[in-house]
Regions:
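Non-catalytic beta/alpha edge segments that cap or flank active sites
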Residues: 1-175
Length: 175
């Protein structure tokens, strides 16, 4: 879908969350890639953190960012697989008010084009919590690239037509 260059680009504030038991700041290649994508697209990197694969820790961090009026969107990397320690989708589900099922569906479709049937092991997901977008991507740099380039780059661009997530932001808190 096209970017309408006659429309004004509206940058948003995005927090990047890396979920990993094994990665520290020095080894966070997926988080680094995601932060670079956010900035390169013209958005503001509002915050960044690395947390352990723990439902309570993840959901607590998400809730703090959702409560922060300076954060419009959270994108995480890691913890979306099938192992016992992969708890990101459960943590996100505790926080969001509404799920965005099409995000995970489209992510897996895009992943299929890159990694074939291995895409069935991904539980990438998204939702909205109190007006803040929450997106959970797998932990590999390739998956981050697929999710950003294939979905988030355009959906977080206010010029994308026929619609985008940014233009919905003022209406997310409607009752």
């Amino acid at each position: 879908m096209p970017i309408d260059m006659t429309r004004k680009f509206k940058p948003i504030r995005i927090a990047v969350l890396t979920i990993s038991d094994s990665r520290g700041r020095a080894e966070d290649t997926s988080g680094d890639l995601l932060a670079e994508c956010v900035i390169k697209a013209g958005h503001e990197l509002g915050d960044r953190a690395i947390v352990k694969d723990d439902v309570e820790i993840i959901s607590d961090r998400l809730r703090r960012w959702v409560a922060d009026t300076e954060i419009d969107c959270v994108i995480s990397t890691g913890g979306t697989g099938l192992t016992g320690r992969d708890v990101t989708p459960a943590a996100f589900a505790r926080v969001w008010d509404k799920e965005i099922p099409g995000f995970g569906e489209l992510f897996r479709y895009l992943s299929y084009q890159t990694i074939g049937t291995s895409m069935v092991q991904s539980r990438a997901c998204a939702g909205v919590a109190s007006g803040t977008y929450l997106f959970a991507l797998p932990g590999s740099p390739g998956a981050v690239k697929d999710g950003w380039d294939g979905i988030l780059l355009t959906q977080l661009d206010s010029r994308h037509r026929p619609c985008n997530f940014v233009e919905l932001m003022p209406r997310l808190r409607e009752t």
